[in-house]
Amino acid sequence: MGEFNEKKTTCGTVCLKYLLFTYNCCFWLAGLAVMAVGIWTLALKSDYISLLASGTYLATAYILVVAGTVVMVTGVLGCCATFKERRNLLRLYFILLLIIFLLEIIAGILAYAYYQQLNTELKENLKDTMTKRYHQPGHEAVTSAVDQLQQEFHCCGSNNSQDWRDSEWIRSQEAGGRVVPDSCCKTVVALCGQRDHASNIYKVEGGCITKLETFIQEHLRVIGAVGIGIACVQVFGMIFTCCLYRSLKLEHY
């Protein structure tokens, strides 16, 4: 009877080892995906960060990059801990899983919270950012972001083209008689912003604020879904780790 129980325990341990190894392979790939989403956000989708008053959007992306990197390292550690049957490594692996779990939950919560407050933030700050910083010394990133925003989304001004009447640059001699930036024009040529007729510039209902809000919200949904989704998967990893740790402890005795 004792021999049967011992074989049963050993068989259970082997099954757990292979189950945890398979999980770690998938977990490593998930870490790569998380890091890729973070880098994708920072490298390709961060053009408009200079237009945002809050750093939350940027913070969520950095958290995903860090979490993804740690996930990949942890996945390798998990494989080593599993096949070497080292309980101290399993403890470390579990702690790292818990840390990553918390990081991804935080990223998901930040993305969701910022999603809720984005409309208010843009309404309060976007017009001031565009009119007070556009073409001003030291704000080249804002100038570039505004021009790209207006060209990419075919819009002009925060709410409408009339917003540019309050622009410090438009009211200066440097504007060369423009009433809107050239990036508002349907066909961009030098000094095309001198005429703000509908046939010449983009007049979109809701202005650039609506377009930017939709753009940011779409990416916040991706960040939030990835963060929360991977965090949920990690719960199974922690359960498998606890089961294997307990199984090894029983065999030890």
From Swiss-Prot:
This protein's GO CC annotations: basement membrane; cell surface; cytosol; focal adhesion; membrane; plasma membrane
Glycosylated residues, chain numbering: N159
Lineage per the UniProt record: Eukaryota, Metazoa, Chordata, Craniata, Vertebrata
Subunit structure: Interacts with integrins ITGA3:ITGB1, ITGA5:ITGB1, ITGA3:ITGB1 and ITGA6:ITGB4 and with CD9 and CD181. Interacts (via the second extracellular domain) with integrin ITGAV:ITGB3. Interacts with ITGA3; this interaction modulates ITGA3 glycosylation pattern. Interacts with F11R. Interacts with RAC1 and CDC42; these interactions mediate physical association of RAC1 and CDC42 with integrin adhesion receptor complexes.
Annotated protein name in UniProt: CD151 antigen
Posttranslational modification: Palmitoylated. Palmitoylation by ZDHHC2 regulates CD151 expression, association with other tetraspanin family proteins and function in cell adhesion.
Keyword entries, A-Z: Blood group antigen, Cell membrane, Deafness, Epidermolysis bullosa, Glycoprotein, Host-virus interaction, Lipoprotein, Membrane, Palmitate, Transmembrane, Transmembrane helix, Ubl conjugation
Tissue expression per record: Expressed in a variety of tissues including vascular endothelium and epidermis. Expressed on erythroid cells, with a higher level of expression in erythroid precursors than on mature erythrocytes. Acts as a sensitive T-cell activation marker.
Membrane-crossing segments per the record: 19-39, 58-78, 92-112, 222-242
Organism of origin: Homo sapiens (Human)
Induction entry: On both CD4 and CD8 T-cells following TCR/CD3 activation.
Stored InterPro entries: Tetraspanin/Peripherin (IPR018499), Tetraspanin_animals (IPR000301), Tetraspanin_CS (IPR018503), Tetraspanin_EC2_sf (IPR008952)
